[in-house]
UniProtKB/Swiss-Prot annotation:
Keywords: Cytoplasm, Lipid A biosynthesis, Lipid biosynthesis, Lipid metabolism, Lyase
Chief location bin: cytoplasm
Main enzyme class: lyase
Residues at the active site: H49
GO terms for cellular component: cytoplasm; membrane
Keyword tRNA-binding: no
Pfam family, one: FabA
InterPro entries: FabA_FabZ, FabZ, HotDog_dom_sf
Entry protein name: 3-hydroxyacyl-[acyl-carrier-protein] dehydratase FabZ
EC number: 4.2.1.59
GO biological process, one term: fatty acid biosynthetic process
Domain of life: Bacteria
Keyword Cytoplasm: yes
Amino acid sequence: MQFNISDIIKILPHSYPFLLVDRVIECDPGKSIKAIKNVTFNEPFFIGHFPGHPIMPGVLIIESLAQASAICVLGKETIENKVVYLRSIENAKFRKPVTPGDTLILQANIQSVCLGVHKFRCIASVSEEKVAEATISAVLQNK
């Protein structure tokens, strides 16, 4: 399954400037997802992070992975009156900086689902090089 930005804005509650997934290139709902965040110099966070040496903040890379994970849980058929909330982030590692012009590939695979908590193994990469990784847990709840 693939989703364009029109699909994504129907699935996620986020909006500019905090919508951090541009396209889904592969999704097996409830199992795995591969998505894209195009990183441009026009991102508002580059104003202060860092002047003259722009780097995407690590927390926003993690947020991008969390948003991709939420799409994986919800799928294209958004569950009415439900939302996915971030529950925990474990073992986050940042390996290389992400800079303007990069295409950030976001991958999340569900490791387990227990009592409504979805646990994902997530990897962010640029040009097939791992730039960040984390284990993210999220819960599907009523709005």
